[in-house]
Amino acid sequence: RVNEKPAELKIERIGASDDRPAPLTAEKLLRGLQGAVMFVRGSATLFENWSESFLATINELPPADQAYCQSIGGDPNIFYFHSAWQLADDEVFVIDAPEIPECQTWNFQLDNWWMESLDYRHHTIHVNKHTAHYNDDGSVRVVVSHADPGVPNWIETAGHNMGTLCW
């Protein structure tokens, strides 16, 4: 983000007709609120169950079930790795990627229990194809820890002791 320039956009609505909505009725409001409740419950259950399943491979980074990822809307052009992580204050989690296939882009990031990215605005919680330090042999080593160990590709936990991760 240090080298990126903010986008400059102009949005203009063209071909607009008078499409003002009808007044909100009690019935429409009720349906909307019921739908919101169903969405929140469904999302919370989905991510809770998914994160629970990652506990079997804590502090590892195995390939995810690609068919499952695609069945819930994952991009078939992406090969997913998911797991959970947990670190004490004095621990580090080292991920070695000896060979990364040629691709347009890749990204590794730390997430919270609900699979939301950690605070990327104030912390370095991800590394990608364009920001990574590559070793001479083309491999990449990512180091996750609470404190900066002074190595390339350090990912900080942003004050969290546990969460999920995705490559």
Predicted regions mapped to residue ranges:
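A compositional/structural signature for long, glycine/proline-rich flexible linkers
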Residues: 1-167
